[in-house]
């Protein structure tokens, strides 16, 4: 039986906005400045903070696939921006861990359809499975913390183009593509997963054709802000003077 779950939104998601401007198609121009149009600016919503209060800003995208034999294939992409860095840092970590048993038998399930999932805008999350006893999840998290010291920089390989890792478990590939960053896993005989962030959207998809797999896609935004400074007496005085002008019609 084919079970499908999909969710779409039509508003530009904040994570996609962050990487969309930082990931033009050529790998050599990953951090070239990109001007936002008036239409894009008109869609921005939320609260704003002064740049001096931002200690660090980071976007993480990770995918892992564990098959029935315990073999794990995956990747993690970290984009980090902080005050003392001249340019953003974009690192990739590829994972291929052996299991405690031979590779599982290829699944015989077929996942059909779903071509329209690649044509959506905004946020698209889908999990489709034609196997049994599988567990899969797509997740998005946003965390805002307060502090003075930024978290340590993540390790990994700087992303200067496509990176890939292949083995008996399958293939994992991280690729800048069309203004977005794609993280794709092709698990041998078990299915495939994809995350794509940028170009105005976020896509998370899982298609399972085998059995007893554990698949996770996660995109996370983390911001650290300085604690709000104490009130400036001169600023409070100016504010009181402005309030006093209200009865006069100003």
Swiss-Prot record:
GO annotation (BP), single: cell adhesion
Tell me yes or no: is NAD among this UniProt entry's keywords: no
Principal place of residence: other
Q: What does this protein do?
A: A minor component of the functional amyloid in this bacterium. Upon overexpression of the endogenous six-gene locus (fapA-fapF), cells form large clumps during liquid growth, make large amounts of biofilm and produce amyloid fibrils.
Q: Which UniProt keywords apply?
A: Amyloid, Cell adhesion, Fimbrium, Secreted, Signal
Q: What is the organism of origin for this protein?
A: Pseudomonas aeruginosa (strain ATCC 15692 / DSM 22644 / CIP 104116 / JCM 14847 / LMG 12228 / 1C / PRS 101 / PAO1)
**N-terminal signal peptide:** 1-27
The compartments listed are: Fimbrium; Secreted
Name the protein family.
Belongs to the FapE family.
Subunit info here reads: A minor component of purified amyloid fibrils. Fibrils are resistant to boiling in 2% (weight/vol) SDS and require >90% (vol/vol) formic acid to dissolve.
Phenotypic effect of disruption: Deletion of the entire fapA-fapF six-gene locus shows no visible growth phenotype.
Protein name (database record): Functional amyloid sbunit FapE
Q: Which GO terms describe its cellular component?
A: extracellular region; pilus
């Amino acid at each position: 039986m084919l079970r499908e779950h999909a969710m779409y939104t039509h508003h530009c998601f904040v994570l996609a906005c962050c990487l969309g401007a930082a990931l033009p198609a050529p790998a050599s121009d990953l951090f070239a400045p990109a001007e936002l149009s008036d239409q894009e600016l008109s869609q921005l919503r939320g609260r704003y903070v002064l740049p001096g209060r931002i200690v660090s800003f980071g976007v993480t995208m990770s995918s892992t696939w564990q098959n029935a034999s315990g073999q794990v294939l995956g990747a993690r992409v970290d984009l980090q921006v902080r005050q003392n860095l001249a340019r953003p840092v974009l690192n990739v970590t590829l994972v291929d861990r052996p299991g405690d048993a031979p590779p599982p038998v290829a699944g015989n399930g077929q996942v059909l359809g779903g071509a329209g999932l690649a044509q959506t805008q905004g946020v698209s999350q889908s999990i489709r499975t034609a196997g049994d006893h599988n567990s899969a999840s797509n997740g998005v998290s946003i965390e805002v913390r307060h502090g003075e010291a930024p978290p340590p920089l993540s390790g990994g390989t700087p992303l200067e183009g496509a990176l890939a890792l292949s083995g008996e478990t399958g293939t994992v590939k991280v690729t800048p593509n069309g203004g977005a960053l794609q993280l794709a896993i092709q698990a041998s005989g078990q299915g495939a997963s994809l995350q794509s962030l940028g170009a105005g959207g976020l896509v998370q998809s899982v298609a399972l054709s085998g059995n007893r797999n554990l698949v996770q896609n996660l995109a996370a935004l983390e911001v650290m802000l300085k604690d709000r400074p104490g009130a400036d007496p001169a600023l409070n005085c100016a504010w009181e003077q402005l309030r006093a002008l209200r009865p006069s019609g100003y």
